[in-house]
Amino acid sequence: MKTLILLIQFFTRIPLPVQINMDEINLKKGSALLPFVGVIIGAWNWLIFTLVALLMPLPVAIIAGLFAEIIITGGFHVDALADTADGLFSSRKRERMLEIMKDSRVGANGVIAICFYFLFYGSLFLSVPDTQQIGWLFFVLPIVAKGVTMLLFAKMTYAGSKAGLGSIFLGVPWWPVVIAQVIVLVALGLFFSYIGVIAYAGVILFTIIYRAFVYKRIGGMNGDTLGAGGQMGQLICLFCLVLLWGLI
């Protein structure tokens, strides 16, 4: 329970008035619980979307659902997406890329990445004809994001500062990664049947390509690239689901 509370405090803005000593927790092994943080985020997103959808048109409800995640996470990973885009597409050397990612200012690449991310994300949601299914997507996709993050933890080389937040998860063993993937697959299977499982295969393929690209650019992961990977992973999952629903 302490591990889950610590993960909630780490990845969300939920005010839990509990002080936990990091020395008492093996966060690397406890990272298997990370998808359950996605469950909490997803439940919040689903609730906000569902309530707004009762009163407002569907596009407004979708925007509310997207904004709900920013509220509960503080835009933690959206900021990481912007920093990653600014750094990796800066056409600079490795050291300079890492410096750019640390910069609190958002550059042109970051703004473009965020704009296209939400435009594409919102368009994909609008492509789903069933309102109830959109609600389930708001619930499940944050779980997928945490599954992708766990995949990126596997045998991770850390490129950022050793004092960086992502370094806490350096050396995560394989078994928490596997457990996290099982949780994600169960969630996708329960809500979207075999199509959800097939869609996650596309997410895994994306994760492999993304990981290789990041390692080639900066030699490993850091907090920003980990957060960006999770954000893009849930976008890719939604894309694969919409594509499969259109084909089948």
Swiss-Prot record:
Biological or metabolic pathway of the protein: Cofactor biosynthesis; adenosylcobalamin biosynthesis; adenosylcobalamin from cob(II)yrinate a,c-diamide: step 7/7
Membrane-spanning residues: 24-44, 70-90, 106-126, 134-154, 157-177, 188-210, 228-248
Keyword Electron transport assigned: no
Cofactor(s), by name: Mg(2+)
Keyword Transferase tagged: yes
Superkingdom to which the source organism belongs: Bacteria
UniProt cross-references to InterPro entries, sorted A to Z: CobS
GO biological process: cobalamin biosynthetic process
EC numbers: 2.7.8.26
Topology term for the membrane: Multi-pass membrane protein
Pfam families hit by this protein: CobS
Gene Ontology molecular functions: adenosylcobinamide-GDP ribazoletransferase activity; cobalamin 5'-phosphate synthase activity
Catalytic activity: alpha-ribazole + adenosylcob(III)inamide-GDP = adenosylcob(III)alamin + GMP + H(+); alpha-ribazole 5'-phosphate + adenosylcob(III)inamide-GDP = adenosylcob(III)alamin 5'-phosphate + GMP + H(+)
Function description: Joins adenosylcobinamide-GDP and alpha-ribazole to generate adenosylcobalamin (Ado-cobalamin). Also synthesizes adenosylcobalamin 5'-phosphate from adenosylcobinamide-GDP and alpha-ribazole 5'-phosphate.
Family that this chain belongs to: Belongs to the CobS family.
Protein name: Adenosylcobinamide-GDP ribazoletransferase
